[in-house]
Amino acid sequence: MTEVSDRQAPHRRVPGPARPVRPGAQRRPGPGARPARRPVPPRKAAPPALRLGSPRPRLRMIGLALTLVLIAFVVRLLQVQAVDASTYAAKAEQNRYVVHTLPAERGGITDRNGVALASTVDSYDITADPTMFTREQLKVGDGPEQAAALLAPILGEDQEALAAKLRPKNKDLRYVRLARGKTPEVWNQIKDLKTALGKKADEDESAVNVLAGVFADPSSKRVYPNGSLAAGILGWVNSEGEGSGGLERKLDRTLAGEDGEIRYAQSGGRQVPTIGANEKPAVPGSGVELTIDRDIQWAAQHAITEQVKESKADGGYVIVQDTRTGEILAMANSPGFDPNNLSDADPAALGNAALQDAYEPGSTAKVMSMAAVLEENAATPATHVVVPNRLHRGDRLFKDDVDHPTWHLTLNGVLAKSSNIGTILATGQLGKTQREANQVLYSYLRKFGLGSYSGLGFPGETKGILAPPGQWSTSQQYTIPFGQGVSINAMQAASVYSTIANGGVRVAPTLVRGTKGPDGRFTPAPEPEKTRVVSEKTAKTLSRMLESVVDDEEGTGTKARIPGYRVAGKTGTANRVDPATGKYRGYTSSFAGFAPADKPRVTVYCAIQNATQGSYFGGQICGPIFKQVMEFALKTLQVPPTGAAPANLPVTFKP
């Protein structure tokens, strides 16, 4: 049985209502009661709680941004690894490997006998490090000046200019070029002096090697061993080694060759020895052999230079040509220039005036008028021509170079005495009307090469001026037959006489005989173009008429006679157009001819522009030049003297 307790559950005491405290009464603490607590001050009200936003939107934005960045990295990685992989691999390869150019050696230029006219030699650019000339380095304040004083006479440079380069305004400059293209001998001289100063400085502490900062960069240099000889033909190369004038420019691709290269791996700026280098050798340029004969060129250049000085002329030219082949044996200009030292050259003298100057030829052009008259059977050498002192044609009054009574000349005499009036009368027979005569004459002038380029392809060459007959003025209809109102260059004039000498066949002039490749094999130049201009009969008749100009006492070319040889030639004296004003001022004096007249080998043409001292007549100042150059050429080429006597054609007739 379950025991039942008789205890009752304790009852919770419920406090009754508090009794009111009487005024002045104090509550006494009972025994064991706790002491009364101080009253607790009322608590401050808590600030209202902030309502925090949800972090989820921010987390979404951050996640989205990180996703986009990751996508960009992935896209870029795909681009680098897949799309542009080859490009970057090539760049890496390029950065890893270094390529150096191996310059090709420029081919040389020689005359027809193998004599060097232009060649390439080793040279040095003299350089310096200006920081090695300071007071701190040399312990002296005038180091640049001392070095300049030693270098100036060796380099041929201005001492003050050298000192200025060694003391630049930029104190951090480490490289200056003191001189360009010096010979190995010059660098050896500087190097020996530098070594001597260095040895002295090692032995004596007070001594200073002021050349310690001078160095040299190996290079190459184009040299012309004969100086100004044939400079107008050869031209020159620029500082980059490229042809900039004459044949150096025209044949630049042939002469330059093909640069090679060497390619090797690098690391830290140094070649990696375990990885082989790939080398593509340079292909040297081909050598060029000219038709020029150096000795004949010298004779022509010397003769024209001396005569230009003596006559105080503006300039002049001489051309020597092989009548049979068209090869040019000499082409000389005065004034000239030295391609080794272009800084001292007159800019007006650069180029080749014999091909670039266009001028009115004067009476040397009468041979073409006579060729037309003979070829058209309008007259013969014996045809009578009555030449008055004055002749009215159109609105002009024409005269010869001298006053004279009425001349009774043969056609041969018209050419021998160089009569302008006689030439007008003769060419007037080329047609029933003056218009027809003009057209016939024009066709022959074109056949002789006037108004066309010579075929040399020379830079800057002029083709002259020959207007169609329909554009000829009234006066030109009568002046063109005697060489006024039409312009040519010296090469065209020489070619006219070579055509007559060659039996009426014009052979295009040539300057290049062939090229010699790096393998030493010679390749001849193409055969020149040949064109028949007049018949062989007409050419031979003209040749005999031209002999009268030189041999007959009444001829204008007596100063061109050469003992032992038959000479055919023609003088010319033309009013000259001043290039500066476009008006006539002075004269063009000329002489053209060939020898031996019976078996022509050589043609020589000479012209002088604006002679101001002595005679200006072509026969007087150019005849002697022709003789001097022709004699030299005939001897050089070993042409035997003439055996047959010259033909005597009548010059005058009795009315």
Residue spans for each PLM region:
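Small/polar-residue-rich segments within soluble enzyme cores
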Residues: 2-9, 146-153, 164-284, 606
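Conserved, well-ordered alpha-helix/loop/beta-strand core segments that scaffold catalytic motifs
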Residues: 272-316
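Short, gly/Ser/Thr-rich active-site loops of penicillin-recognizing serine hydrolases
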Residues: 522-528, 623-655
